[in-house]
Swiss-Prot record:
GO terms for molecular function: ATP binding; metal ion binding; NAD binding; NAD+ kinase activity. Its cofactor is a divalent metal cation. It is an enzyme of class 2 (transferase). InterPro entries: ATP-NAD_kinase_N, ATP-NAD_kinase_PpnK-typ_C, NAD/diacylglycerol_kinase_sf, NADK. This is NAD kinase. Coiled coil: none annotated. HAMAP family: NAD_kinase. NCBIfam families: PRK03372.1 (NF002892). Its EC number is 2.7.1.23. Disulfide bonds: none annotated.
C-alpha cells in the first residue's frame, strides 16, 4: 500500500518513526528513511499528530499527508501507549524535545530509541544528520547495542494519600506556581531532613538529565555510566543549598511548607503534576529504564566537547 495507509501487512521487522513536524528538510529526510527501510524489507510506522489522552501528552508528529510517496508502504499511527508495540525500535528525527516525546512511546513498549539530530544541540541524539545513511545501514544490519538509562519515578502525596504519579528521563522540576514570592520547601534524603529554604524550585535529575535543565541551574555534569540522583536547588535563598549527588537507591523528598505557594512538578517539561501547598514530592530511581541505542563506543567526554563546543586547544594528551 502507498504512504498514508494503515493496513500495511505486518513485516518481520518494523520501526516507528517520530519526526519533528513542519520543517521541509525533516519531511524529506523522513521520506528518505522510508525508502531505505522499504528496500531492506523493514516495515515503517509513522506517527501522526493525533493525541491519545489516556497516557501520552499532546505530541506533534507528522501530518499524514506529509508522508505520501507513491509506492512507499507505511503504516500511519496515532500517539498513544500502543503506538510502538511490536516495533523493533523508535527512530527519532529531530532535537531533544522530539527525542523526549519519542522516549514516552519507547518506554511504554519496552523497546529502544535511536535519535538522529536534526535540531540544534541534540544532546540526546546518537548521531547527526550527515551520518544518517551510515546509521540506517547499521540499523538494517542490526549492528547496534542497547544501553539502559535510568529514569525517575515521581509521586505527590497529601496527608499520605498519593494524588499524582509521573516519571522522567531527564528531570523532575519542582516549581512555584506563582511567579510572585518564593516556594518554601524542606529537602529530605533517605528519610532525614537536610535543609529548608525558599527558592524558585528544585530539580531532581538523572545523569542523562545532568546536561539539560540541571546543568543550566548550576548542577554538575554526570557521566551516564554512573547511576546517581542529582538534587539542584534553583535560586535558593539559603547558605546551604548546593547541588547534591546521592545514591541511585536514595529516596529524595521535597516538602512544600503549609501556607506557602502551590507548586507544579514538570516531568521532562512534558508531563505536569499538581503540587498543592503542604504536599510532598517523592522521587526514586524508576522501575522502567529507557533503552538507548548506541551505534559506536565514542567516549562521553568527546560528545560533551562536541555538543557544547568546549575549547580544548593546547591539549597534549595521548591520542586514542
Amino acid at each position: 500500500m502507498s504512504g498514508g495507509s494503515s493496513g500495511t501487512q505486518q513485516r518481520e521487522r518494523e520501526i516507528l518513526l517520530v519526526a519533528h513536524p513542519g520543517r521541509a528538510e525533516i519531511t524529506e529526510t523522513a521520506r528518505r528513511v522510508g525508502k531505505i527501510f522499504e528496500r531492506a524489507g523493514i516495515g515503517l510506522r509513522v506517527l501522526v499528530d493525533e493525541v491519545d489522552s489516556t497516557r501520552i501528552e499532546p505530541m506533534d508528529g507528522m501530518a499524514a499527508d506529509e508522508f505520501l510517496v507513491p509506492g512507499l508502504e507505511v503504516t500511519i499511527v496515532q500517539a498513544g501507549p500502543d503506538a510502538a508495540l511490536g516495533c523493533e525500535m523508535v527512530l527519532v528525527l529531530g532535537g531533544d524535545g522530539t527525542f523526549l516525546r519519542a522516549a514516552e512511546l519507547a518506554q511504554a513498549a519496552s523497546i529502544p530509541v535511536l535519535g538522529i539530530n536534526l535540531g540544534r544541540i541534540g544532546f540526546l541524539a546518537e548521531t547527526e544528520a550527515e551520518h544518517l545513511d551510515e546509521a540506517l545501514a547499521q540499523v538494517v544490519r542490526r549492528e547496534y547495542r542497547i544501553e539502559h538509562r535510568m529514569t525517575l519515578d515521581v509521586l505527590v502525596r497529601v496527608d499520605d494519600e498519593i494524588i499524582e504519579r509521573g516519571w522522567a528521563l531527564n528531570e523532575a522540576s519542582i516549581e512555584n506556581r506563582s511567579r510572585l514570592g518564593v516556594l518554601e520547601v524542606v529537602l529530605e534524603v533517605d528519610g532525614r531532613p537536610v535543609s529548608a529554604f525558599g527558592c524558585d524550585g528544585v530539580l531532581i535529575s538523572t545523569p542523562t538529565g545532568s546536561t539539560a535543565y540541571a546543568f543550566s541551574a548550576g548542577g554538575p555534569v554526570v557521566w551516564p555510566e554512573l547511576e546517581a540522583l542529582l538534587v539542584v536547588p534553583s535560586n535558593a535563598h539559603a547558605l546551604f543549598a548546593r547541588p547534591l549527588v546521592t545514591s541511585p537507591n536514595s529516596l529524595i523528598a521535597v516538602e512544600t511548607v503549609a501556607g506557602s505557594h502551590d507548586g507544579l512538578v514538570f516531568c521532562d517539561g512534558r508531563r505536569t503534576l499538581e503540587l498543592p501547598a503542604g504536599a510532598r514530592v517523592e522521587v526514586v530511581r524508576g522501575k522502567e529504564p529507557v533503552r538507548w541505542i548506541r551505534l559506536d563506543s565514542a567516549p562521553f567526554a568527546d560528545r560533551m566537547v562536541r555538543k557544547f563546543e568546549l575549547p580544548v586547544t593546547g591539549w597534549r594528551g595521548r591520542k586514542p
